[in-house]
Amino acid sequence: MSVTVRVPAKVNVQLAVGGARPDGFHDLANVFLAVGLYDEVTATPADELRITCEGPDAAQVPLDRTNLAARAAIALAARHGLAPDVHLHIAKDIPVAGGMAGGSADAAGALLACDTLWGTNASRGELLDICAELGSDVPFSLVGGAALGTGRGERLRELEVGGTFHWVFAVADGGLSTPAVYGEFDRLSEGVRVPEPVASQELLDALAKGDAVALAAAVSNDLQPAALSLFPSLSDTLEAGRAAGALAALVSGSGPTTAFLTRDADGADAVAQALLASGTCRTARVAPSPAPGATVL
């Protein structure tokens, strides 16, 4: 028997970042939107914990116990007095180290797959607790849809979305380390008073109404200057998307994937083609949002 779970990528339509906390994390007001790019995690009984991976960026995925999917299996097994003997196979379609929570998606997928395979019947609350221990974005990967994340992003309030939003994601050559981007944010903020992060009411209203034009006017990412400082060529990608008619262009999370909101599906296809023709990205992916969270297939 094996269990396969499909898990979406995410885009941050607002990422408001506070100053560094004593524990090194930052308080956030993080509005997540799950998008229709997916990884699939398959759990199969095995004699030991083993990770395999396929997909365009598979070579960049660690196959040892540092992999978040492996850590998820270990955490669930430890809570229930089990050995984490499972083969986790990741079919990877979410960009690696791209600011779209691909690793977090794999953790949420592995957690739900192992819970189903092992019959541990963890409550939603227990699964979310384990997710929060694994990383700030993992709880949202489990939940999907749209949500406001506070604290370091792990405390979620689900949000209403009144329609479908159409996105293009331009995948860069190379990755960005999330800790490095936060470190650059701290460096750029030195000597500056960083305000408390607060969710934008205009943005929440735009999501609830399904209004792409209003959402485009409200999107923001406080990590964008830091990501552009470390990866300056992303400015060219953002400009190419704007020139092609995107309603909004921003770095997705800590980058280096860039996200472009369009008016409709035809607009998304046109922006994707223009981005590819511009030579400013490795590939461009079209995806709608919102998308469901981790789902057993």
From Swiss-Prot:
The active site is at 10, 137. SUPFAM superfamilies: GHMP Kinase, C-terminal domain (SSF55060), Ribosomal protein S5 domain 2-like (SSF54211). InterPro entries: GHMP_kinase_C_dom, GHMP_kinase_C_sf, GHMP_kinase_N_dom, IspE, Ribosomal_Su5_D2-typ_SF, Ribsml_uS5_D2-typ_fold_subgr. Pathway: Isoprenoid biosynthesis; isopentenyl diphosphate biosynthesis via DXP pathway; isopentenyl diphosphate from 1-deoxy-D-xylulose 5-phosphate: step 3/6. Keywords: ATP-binding, Isoprene biosynthesis, Kinase, Nucleotide-binding, Transferase. The keyword Cell membrane does not apply. ATP binds at residues 95-105. One of its GO terms (biological process) is terpenoid biosynthetic process. It comes from the Bacteria. It catalyses: 4-CDP-2-C-methyl-D-erythritol + ATP = 4-CDP-2-C-methyl-D-erythritol 2-phosphate + ADP + H(+). Its EC number is 2.7.1.148. GO terms for molecular function: 4-(cytidine 5'-diphospho)-2-C-methyl-D-erythritol kinase activity; ATP binding. Belongs to the GHMP kinase family. IspE subfamily. Catalyzes the phosphorylation of the position 2 hydroxy group of 4-diphosphocytidyl-2C-methyl-D-erythritol. NCBIfam families: ispE, PRK03188.1. This is 4-diphosphocytidyl-2-C-methyl-D-erythritol kinase. The gene is ispE.
